[in-house]
């Protein structure tokens, strides 16, 4: 069993983009930014516990940080790990829905 403190640190934020929105509408998939060391099992447990939904599958990927320049200084943005969480049929999770 994964500790509750760890589950709270696994999910960083929902990733909201045009692709993520189309994915949510088309295949019931939600996209999250997650901790770099998070496993698929931890991500699944965190989503199921925090949002009380059933998760069908979890796919992860790491986006490499871009190299950026400002004048003569050169730096690099941090790498980011994203998780595509597919929910079971009939499950719904809405982050961008309008407030009433």
Swiss-Prot record:
Primary role: One of the early assembly proteins it binds 23S rRNA. One of the proteins that surrounds the polypeptide exit tunnel on the outside of the ribosome. Forms the main docking site for trigger factor binding to the ribosome.
GO cellular component: ribonucleoprotein complex; ribosome
Assigned protein family: Belongs to the universal ribosomal protein uL23 family.
Spans traversing the lipid bilayer: none
The organism's place on the tree of life at top rank: Bacteria
The gene coding this protein: rplW
Biological processes, Gene Ontology terms: translation
Keywords: Ribonucleoprotein, Ribosomal protein, RNA-binding, rRNA-binding
Name of the featured protein: Large ribosomal subunit protein uL23
Claim: Cytoplasm is one of the keywords in the record: no
GO molecular function terms listed in the Swiss-Prot or TrEMBL record: rRNA binding; structural constituent of ribosome
Subunit-level organization: Part of the 50S ribosomal subunit. Contacts protein L29, and trigger factor when it is bound to the ribosome.
Xref: InterPro entries: Nucleotide-bd_a/b_plait_sf, Ribosomal_uL23-like, Ribosomal_uL23/eL15/eS24_sf, Ribosomal_uL23_CS
């Amino acid at each position: 069993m994964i500790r509750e403190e760890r589950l709270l640190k696994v999910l960083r934020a929902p990733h909201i983009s045009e692709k993520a929105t189309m994915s949510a509408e088309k295949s019931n998939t939600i996209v999250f930014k997650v901790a770099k060391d998070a496993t698929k099992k931890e991500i699944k447990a965190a989503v199921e516990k925090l949002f009380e939904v059933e998760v069908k599958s979890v796919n992860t990927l790491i986006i490499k940080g871009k190299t950026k320049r400002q004048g003569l200084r050169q730096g690099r943005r941090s790498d980011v790990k994203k998780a595509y969480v597919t929910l079971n049929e009939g499950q719904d999770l809405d982050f961008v829905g309008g407030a009433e």
